[in-house]
């Protein structure tokens, strides 16, 4: 299923890289279209789920495209930027340059893989592992990690659930062991990021800034870890606060939500939405051409 068909590059008389050809004169106009596709069945299931809630679906927007509206600045889009959105199960990577979207890739890995690794390593419940990751997890080691003991259970839940592997009598583990598990999974994820960016030509001098978004970007120290792994500047993308949205939504985990609002407000060009009635299907000459011009004048003036 086609989600988007948007102009990536315009060409005027053989000159590439024209951002907006409106108002320019040329003998020949060309356009390279970036098409975003997805499996049809999951998209239709999502649409039906929304419609079951008695809501209408105006459009389906790819998450990387929406997040870019919330987290990437126009200057970054122009100079070259890669947006890496770390979700629960999937990490989406989009590359932008010259103000246009140039490539998209998805990696079937996400922050849930870190949670599962913690649960497996310490033999604890997944809910306990998720709490450890969010509260005490970090992508950067500290000299005090070996001496710092962190409780596996949340306050008020002492004695519940299994005793963690390697824990003390109070069911506490060394923070260094937790950080080791987190960084091991992150190393695998950043390796996939590096390969995907290279496949899209975002490497060496052709690459630029990297922006992290998604719930996985809220892990402590992840920007520094990814920057060291990819060898380029990395920042955390935080969406702007919108009137009517809670303050808690101005975090990387809600980048897609805020981006959907901004995308709908911007209403970018999609080739599929262009009215075919304004596209000539045959050549006009003589009186036919004159009549065509007069018809256009009447329609617009």
Map each language-model feature to its residues.
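A short acidic Gly-Thr/Ser loop motif
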Residues: 83-90, 96-99, 107-112, 214-219
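Conserved phosphate-binding/catalytic loops in two-lobed NTP-binding clefts
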Residues: 228-257
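Phosphate/pyrophosphate-binding loops at sites that engage ATP/ADP/AMP, CoA/4′-phosphopantetheine
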Residues: 190, 194-209
């Amino acid at each position: 299923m086609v989600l988007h068909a948007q102009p990536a590059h315009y060409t005027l008389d053989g000159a590439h890289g024209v951002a907006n050809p409106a108002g320019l004169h040329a003998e020949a106009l060309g356009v390279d279209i970036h098409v975003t596709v997805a499996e049809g069945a999951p998209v239709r299931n999502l649409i039906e789920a929304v419609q079951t809630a008695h809501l209408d679906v105006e459009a389906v927007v790819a998450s990387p495209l929406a997040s870019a509206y919330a987290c990437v600045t126009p200057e970054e889009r122009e100079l070259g930027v890669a947006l890496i959105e770390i979700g629960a199960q999937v990490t989406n990577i989009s590359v932008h340059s010259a103000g246009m979207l140039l490539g998209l890739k998805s990696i079937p890995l996400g922050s849930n893989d870190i949670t599962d690794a913690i649960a497996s390593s310490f033999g604890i419940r997944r809910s306990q592992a998720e709490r450890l990751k969010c509260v005490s997890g970090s992508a950067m080691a500290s000299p005090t990690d070996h001496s710092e003991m962190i409780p596996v259970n949340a306050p008020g839940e002492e004695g519940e659930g299994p005793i963690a592997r390697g824990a003390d009598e109070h069911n506490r583990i060394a923070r260094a062991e937790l950080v080791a598990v987190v960084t091991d999974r992150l190393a695998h994820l950043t390796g996939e990021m590096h390969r995907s960016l290279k496949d899209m030509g975002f490497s060496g001098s052709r690459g630029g800034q990297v922006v992290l978004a998604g719930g996985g970007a809220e892990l402590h120290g992840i920007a520094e870890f990814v920057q060291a792994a990819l060898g380029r500047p990395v920042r955390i993308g935080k969406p702007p606060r919108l009137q009517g949205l809670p303050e808690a939504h101005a975090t990387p985990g809600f980048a897609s939500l805020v981006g959907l609002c901004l995308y709908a407000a911007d209403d970018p060009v999609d080739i599929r939405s262009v009215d075919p009635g304004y596209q000539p299907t045959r050549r006009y000459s003589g009186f036919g051409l004159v009549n065509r011009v007069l018809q256009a004048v009447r329609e617009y003036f």
